[in-house]
């Protein structure tokens, strides 16, 4: 066979690695079968193929003498067919019936779509968490606003109490500055003399003077009873 002569001439040279790919029908769950095709180069028909998963042998197949590849069919639900990276390798018999193995192929990953109910549940939980976070944020904002309004109300009440107290003090101070100008009533000199038991004389009448006030209408001082409340 041509490949036997090639191997004999190559000696210890490595055999080219095969190609690997996932073929349809593709699995939609872990219960569905997995189909993986492994193909050797054109000069190596009828080779023996080995499928690996994580360094462990999963399945062995031999290609027909006129074909250069095989398709591995891994039944669903089997412990040997979980999802994960797969590699394949092929081997041929060289001169003196010595087995020659190729390099490992590139990895192929098999993943399963997430079930719909899990997706719906995840979205529901995420929405509930976002809603809860939003409610907590709104509650904190409302509480902060209420505390601020309550503080403003307390400040206003304290300010008005201080103003009323200051107004009372100022009213008391105003009474000290109020001038009471009352004019004493005039009395007849004769009446005064009668009370004193003496006869009024012109000189006495002239010496008596009517009391007068220094101001007929004193003005009330102007001031403000309101003070700025910080």
UniProtKB/Swiss-Prot annotation:
Positions glycosylated per UniProt: 48, 97
Main location: membrane
Alphabetized UniProt keyword annotations: Glycoprotein, Membrane, Signal, Transmembrane, Transmembrane helix
Spans within the Extracellular topological domain: 20-117
Renumbered residue ranges of the record's region Disordered: 186-230
Gene Ontology CC entries for this record: membrane
Keyword Ligase in annotation: no
Residue intervals passing through the bilayer: 118-138
Topology within the bilayer: Single-pass type I membrane protein
Signal peptide location: 1-19
Topology Cytoplasmic: residue spans: 139-230
Domain of life: Eukaryota
Compartmental location: Membrane
Biased composition (Low complexity): 212-230
PANTHER family per the UniProt record, alphabetical: PROTEIN HIDE1 (PTHR36859:SF1)
The name this protein goes by in its record: Protein HIDE1
Source organism: Homo sapiens
Organism taxonomic ancestry: Eukaryota, Metazoa, Chordata, Craniata, Vertebrata
Gene: HIDE1
